[in-house]
């Protein structure tokens, strides 16, 4: 099981009230990993990233997708390793260009898995 699948399982476990659909789409490059639907009736996407450094790698297609879809799109990053201060960080899709350049030095909209989950649950409320 890959690291992003493990991250998905953690996210799903912490958010039983969100309906999750994993998107495995080879015909639309750059499409985020997850489509979520919360109890407020709000759809949103989440790109999952796991990194052992402060850098997050994105394909040009992923960057383009988030630039074209800046609202209700998120990037959830899990930092692995002994120097990881904030293991789980979430960023708005509209910040992807800055996130691609600065990595985890960029200020996240949420820190910690619980806070990230609460943010997604409250969208549209």
Q: Which residue ranges define each predicted feature?
A:
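Acidic-basic catalytic patches of nuclease active cores, encompassing PD-(D/E)XK
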Residues: 1-25, 39
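Intrinsic disorder/low-complexity segments
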Residues: 122-124
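Short, electropositive alpha-helical surface patch
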Residues: 97-107
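Long, intrinsically disordered low-complexity tandem-repeat segments
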Residues: 108-118
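Nucleic-acid nuclease catalytic cores
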Residues: 68-97
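Beta-rich catalytic cores
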Residues: 30
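Conserved catalytic cores of phosphodiester-cleaving nucleases, focusing on short active-site segments
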Residues: 34-36, 42-52
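Mg2+/Mn2+-dependent nuclease catalytic core
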Residues: 51-70
